[in-house]
Every structure is written in C-alpha cells, then in structure tokens.
Regions:
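Short beta-strand/loop motif that positions the catalytic acidic residue
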Residues: 237, 243-245, 249
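Acidic catalytic loop of the alpha/beta-hydrolase fold
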Residues: 202, 248-252
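Mobile cap/lid helix-loop segments that gate and shape the active-site cleft of serine hydrolases
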Residues: 43-52, 198-233, 239
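N-terminal cap/lid segment of alpha/beta-hydrolase-fold proteins
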Residues: 4-73
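C-terminal catalytic histidine-bearing segment of alpha/beta-hydrolase fold enzymes
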Residues: 244, 254, 258-308
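Catalytic nucleophile-loop/oxyanion-hole region of alpha/beta-hydrolase
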Residues: 89-91, 95-98, 112-150, 289-294
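Primarily recognizes the serine-hydrolase "nucleophile elbow" in alpha/beta-hydrolase
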Residues: 134-207, 225, 295
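Short beta-strand element of the alpha/beta-hydrolase
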Residues: 75-83
Length: 308
C-alpha cells in the first residue's frame, strides 16, 4: 500500500464503483421517519484535481447500501459508515477507496448512506442509528446472498460516521424504529467495531463542535450530552473494538479515541488502539499514502481476523 500511487488508487476506485451494486435499506426506499423531513437528496461529484472521484451526498431520505464484493469472499462482511460532520456522507474517500484493499483479502464491504440528525426526520437525532440498525439486520437476513457468515458482520466508521458505528455498537438493542418485516427479527449487534478518527463524546472539552451542533444543538441538556457521549454508553456486551487516530488531528481530538479505549478497557471489552503521530483528520486511504499511518488497513484486517 505504501507504494501505491494516487492515480493507481483512483483507477482501482473507479473499477470498484463500476462493479458495485446498490440497494435500499428500507422497503419503500424512504425511511418511515422521512415523511416529515423537508430535505431533498443531492449528489455532489468532484472529479478534478488530486481529490478526484470524491462524491458526497446530502439530504438523504432513505439509506442505501453499496456492495463491494470480492472475487473470493472470506465470509466476513463489514458495514461501512463514512463521515461528513453529520452534514453529508462522503462516498469515496471513506467508502469506495477501501474496496481495493479489503476485497483483496476477501472482505465484503457494504458502504452505506444514512440520514442526518438535523434534517427534520421523525427519529430526530436517532435517525442515523435507525438506519444503521436496520442495515445490520438486513445484511444478517440476506448474508447468504454474499456467501457470508451472519455471525461475522462488523461495522467500520469514520469521523461522524464513526459515531454512527459506535452508536450501533453501544445501542444496538435500543428500539428507535418500529419493526416492519422479518429482517427486523435479526440482531443489530455487530461482531466487531472498527472506529477511525471517530467522534465519540459530546463533552465540550474534547468534542467535535460541528457534529455536536448537528446532533444535539447548541444548548443540550445534561441528559442529551450523556445519551450521545458513547464512552458513557459502553457495556460489557459492547463488541470488540479497534481504534485508529492521528495524534495531530485538528478536527476530532485524539482524546475521543482515548476515552473510548479507557471505557472499553474498564469493562473488559477486547480493544486495540493505534495512534499515529501524523495523519491529520480524514486521511482515509488516499491521504495516508506515504505516511506511516498508511499501514492501517493491514493492521485492521489482521485484528479482525483474530475476532471472527
């Protein structure tokens, strides 16, 4: 990975996207709670400069999953929740760019879009959690379609999308939507969590202001802060967790990963954390090239292999 050029990565991303298949998380396309939301879906494409092929979406009304399937599945699936400050979802930097590396090792990736907490959905701040719970249950129900073991489905999240993933790992059994079909009889608990430069806490000392604003507003109650500070929602049943962060992250402070590590360790949850001196925020795959942090996919895949 260290010697992969940006142009090679772009080519592999485009090939992965061309092969991918997308389907809705909710049966009618739109989420049940979207009926009261005024937002309109918008896809923004950026195909210029060094950040070429960097799509993002806003105004999501119904979550979708894009499947990046390997030639030889190893039975493990990963539901991916990309970041975007709880304002948008980036599709490539923390989505399609992962496919060449994880598919090569047999991992099937399911990159999802999800609704924003500030877009006026009936579930409010829990709209993203409703989407990711439903997504995990749907993947379990359909695991055979992709030659997967339903017990080996985990979640990987980045930045604000990491908060979505960590919400799934700590709040998987909370009823945030009404069951609509047999898929909802499945467990939403992921087999493992992989959290990359993740927003964890809502406490002001180390929070990410943009994500906090979108999730709980500017004047949250103490209960709201506790409810969405995921280091305070950890239990002994929280899945094994992999944490990755750059110490020089100027947006989401590295202390987010540190407090999550401490909370997991205190309750005996298996946890591994990798901190790198350099990387800034949002390095994903592309911006990690040429830095020591570029080894992170290999580290993560080796760790996953010990947990499933």
């Amino acid at each position: 990975m260290k010697t992969l050029s940006h142009s090679d990565l772009l080519q592999r991303m485009e090939e992965a996207v061309a092969r991918a298949v997308t389907f809705p998380v909710w049966p009618t396309g739109e989420a049940p709670g979207a009926a009261v939301s005024p937002v309109t879906f918008h896809l923004e494409e950026n195909h210029t400069g060094p950040s070429a092929f960097d799509r993002s979406v806003t105004g999501v009304r119904g979550a979708q999953i894009t499947v990046y399937a390997p030639e030889k599945p190893n039975g493990v699936g990963i539901l991916v929740t990309p970041g975007g400050s709880y304002r948008r979802v980036v599709l490539d930097k923390e989505g399609s760019a992962l496919a060449p590396f994880f598919n090569a090792r047999g991992y099937t990736l399911f990159v999802m879009t999800y609704r924003m907490p500030g877009d006026g959905h009936a579930e409010g701040a829990d709209a993203p959690l409703a989407d990711v719970q439903r997504a995990m249950r749907l993947l379990r129900a359909r695991a055979n379609e992709w030659h997967l073991d339903a017990k080996k489905l985990g979640v990987m999240g980045f930045s604000a999308g990491g908060h979505v993933a960590a919400s799934l790992g700590t709040r998987y059994d909370e009823a945030v939507y009404t069951a609509i079909d047999d898929a909802d009889n499945q467990s939403a608990r992921p087999a493992f969590m992989a959290l990359v430069y993740t927003v964890i806490t809502m406490h002001k000392e180390i929070d990410h202001p943009g994500s906090r604003h979108e999730l709980i507003g500017d004047t949250p109650t103490a209960e709201q802060i506790h409810h969405y500070s995921l280091e305070e929602r950890v239990s002994a049943d929280t899945p094994p967790t992999f944490l990755l962060h750059a110490v020089d992250d100027p947006a989401v402070k590295v202390e987010n990963s540190v407090v999550m590590f401490s909370a997991l360790r205190k309750l005996g949850v298996p946890v591994e954390m990798h901190l790198f001196e350099q990387g800034q925020h949002g390095f994903g795959i592309r911006d990690a090239l040429g830095l020591p942090v570029a080894v992170w996919p290999e580290l993560m895949m080796e760790w996953i292999g010990t947990k499933v």
